[in-house]
Amino acid sequence: MSADVNPPIAEAFEPDLLDSLADTVLGYGVKALLVKLGQRGIYLRTAAGEVWQKGGRGLEGLDDHWHDRALWAPAYRVVPNGTTGAGDAAIAGFLASILQGAVPETALKMAAAAGAACVEAETAITGLTDWDELWARIQRGWDSHPLDLQLYGWDWVEGQGLWEKSA
């Protein structure tokens, strides 16, 4: 049996590589970097407070909960039907959460949920789900994939159902 020389790109991303990528991207003035990683979940890194002072449409109401954060949410388990539109759905779930004034933990879980709902649907359009319906599914204990990585310097936040990088 030969090794897979072309693994899916999401499997190539290790936590240290993501941190390095995030440092570079945030260095360009980006306020929030969201990286969808398939079954490995979804990664969020946000800029320090001074970058947030510059504002930006839709971001005015975000408080210091959004400053200088590194979060990683697991992918929710679904029976997959296709991945078309899953990334777009995840971004839409994230942005909808921001517009509703959600904290980063909620926005990240909603991004993972919206992407998962799209993957389990027959088409990208039928995977579009109401925000309240997705949140209720998360609250009911939607099962997630275990992360097959060692996250050194990250802590599992039990009440939130995600990992946060230690300061």
Sequence positions of predicted segments:
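Conserved phosphate-binding/catalytic region of the ribokinase-like
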Residues: A3-A167
